[in-house]
């Protein structure tokens, strides 16, 4: 919807400005992307691909948009990528983004043939939109990573599939795997 597009576009613009030149690309996914009637309190879901973690977090700290030490956020990014942050400029009056922050190298590994887990893979083989790239080469690189990940869906799901499957079963199993290890605030209903 137009309201979602407007909020997402404004958040991207501010995030890129506050990111200090470290953002290479931004992908949008989730309820705002697929239009499943997110309410006004729903965060816009972004994957923020950065050139360097320290530069990105230092820039957000300088802009007053990060409330943790730069060294901690940059360090944790190397231990367990992606970091997840809330980006809420103007105290969230213009919208809130849930940002999965990942370097190009970590994104390539997460979407490759031997990922450490299914966290990013399960999200990014779904419908996503490339909403920002600093260069057309960055955009092409991201699209290539997504295409490769999507081509490998059956290979990474194969050990978890039992019996005959259809598209619905495949999609459900993919979501179960990618979200299964999370503690989520949403209702269990």
Question: How should these model regions be labeled?
Answer:
Residues 1-22, 27, 33-41, 50-189:
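Catalytic core of pol beta-like nucleotidyltransferases
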């Amino acid at each position: 919807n137009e309201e979602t597009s407007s909020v997402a576009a404004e958040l991207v613009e501010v995030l890129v400005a506050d990111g200090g030149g470290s953002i290479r690309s931004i992908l949008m996914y989730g309820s705002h992307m697929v239009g499943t009637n997110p309410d006004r309190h729903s965060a816009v879901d972004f994957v923020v691909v950065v050139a360097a973690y320290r530069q990105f977090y230092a820039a957000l700290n300088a802009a007053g948009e990060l409330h943790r030490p730069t060294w901690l956020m940059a360090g944790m990014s190397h231990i367990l990528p992606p970091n997840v942050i809330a980006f809420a400029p103007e105290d969230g009056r213009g919208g809130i983004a849930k940002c999965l922050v990942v370097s190009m190298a970590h994104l390539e590994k997460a979407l490759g043939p031997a990922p450490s887990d299914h966290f990013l893979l399960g999200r990014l083989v779904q419908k996503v939109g490339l909403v920002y790239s600093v260069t057309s080469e960055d955009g092409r690189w991201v699209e290539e990573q997504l295409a490769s990940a999507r081509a490998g869906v059956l290979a990474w799901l194969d050990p978890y599939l039992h019996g005959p499957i259809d598209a619905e079963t495949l999609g459900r199993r993919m979501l179960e795997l990618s979200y299964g290890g999370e503690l989520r605030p949403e209702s269990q209903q």
